């Protein structure tokens, strides 16, 4: 049996609470994230983002004939990686997405599933790039756009030849393989998905395939009134997920906790970091923080650039912290 959680931290807490309720020693079930499960079924390795940027840069320079340096390409490359990932996670048709459609007849033939308003919007967008006397910026945009599909295809082929892939590519390949009727080498008789929320198209279709094979069960973390409020956009996923992937067992209702929120206005990032020090110091002075209280205490930053100032603001009394946040290669 395997349990699939949104992230590894959730899995660690699950193991902690499982050990507390177990009367006797037991072997822990396999704990995975949904990314781990996709990678396991694909047989591919998750490609390193930095190496992918260099690979993408080499292909881009060769296909476009551009003389951009890697530094100049970096921002553009990051955006392309994100776009390619979204294309595959949402199972979009990349060839059609990157089509350079300017003729209304061509739009009507290739995009007959669109409404008249959508066709008009697409035509309006592309027609703006074909006035008499194209500007250099328009020409550059069109030149880049025309190589995007070939860039996407060669980039994926290069990664596949190395036995690697980015998340969306791996997700898509696993789903398409299962939908063709191929049976992945599943080492688990039962897979329980816990606490997932906003699912991409590839994730939905993956869960549907496992559900069809009767090896998946689903449990959703929808306790908050705001999440279940039909007037709140967040509730869209609640009804959709519960209807498509119901739980096989009914769990007892969780006790709702009343949240207390205090808003403190501080204009600068450094000021926010200093106030974190003040708050943590006060909590440590009031009573020695137990290990359980420490586990339930989190500092959530709105900006990754605040990470270093906040780390420097941690009081000396707090000896151990767990940082789960990325930091940019350049600031």
Which residue ranges define each predicted feature?
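Nucleic acid-machinery interaction/catalytic patches
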Residues: 1-331
């Amino acid at each position: 049996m395997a349990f699939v959680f949104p992230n590894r931290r959730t899995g660690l807490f699950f193991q902690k609470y499982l050990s507390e309720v177990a009367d006797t020693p037991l072997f822990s079930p396999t704990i995975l994230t949904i990314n781990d499960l996709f990678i396991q079924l694909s047989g591919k390795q998750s490609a390193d983002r930095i190496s992918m940027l260099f690979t993408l840069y080499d292909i881009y320079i060769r296909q476009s004939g551009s003389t951009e340096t890697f530094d100049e390409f970096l921002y553009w490359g990051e955006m392309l990686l994100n776009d390619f990932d979204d294309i595959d996670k949402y199972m979009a048709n990349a060839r059609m997405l990157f089509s350079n459609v300017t003729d209304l007849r061509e739009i009507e033939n290739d995009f007959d599933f669109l409404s008249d308003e959508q066709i008009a919007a697409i035509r309006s967008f592309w027609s703006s790039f074909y006035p008499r006397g194209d500007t250099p910026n328009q020409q550059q945009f069109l030149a880049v756009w025309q190589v995007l599909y070939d860039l996407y295809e060669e980039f994926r082929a290069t990664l596949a030849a190395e036995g690697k892939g980015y998340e969306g590519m791996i997700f898509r390949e696993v789903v398409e393989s299962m939908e063709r009727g191929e049976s992945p080498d599943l080492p688990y008789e039962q897979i329980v998905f816990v606490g997932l929320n906003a699912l991409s198209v590839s994730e939905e279709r993956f869960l549907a395939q496992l559900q069809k094979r009767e090896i998946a069960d689903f449990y959703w973390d929808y306790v908050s009134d705001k999440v279940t409020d039909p007037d709140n956009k967040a509730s869209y996923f609640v009804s959709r997920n519960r209807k498509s992937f119901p739980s096989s067992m009914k769990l007892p209702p969780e006790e709702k906790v009343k949240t207390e929120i205090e808003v403190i206005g501080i204009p600068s990032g450094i000021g926010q970091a200093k106030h974190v020090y003040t708050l943590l110091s006060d909590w440590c002075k009031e009573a020695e923080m137990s290990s359980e209280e420490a586990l339930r205490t989190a500092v959530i930053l709105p900006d990754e650039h605040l990470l270093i100032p906040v780390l420097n603001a941690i009081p000396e009394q707090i000896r151990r912290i767990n940082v789960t946040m990325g930091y940019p290669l350049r600031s």
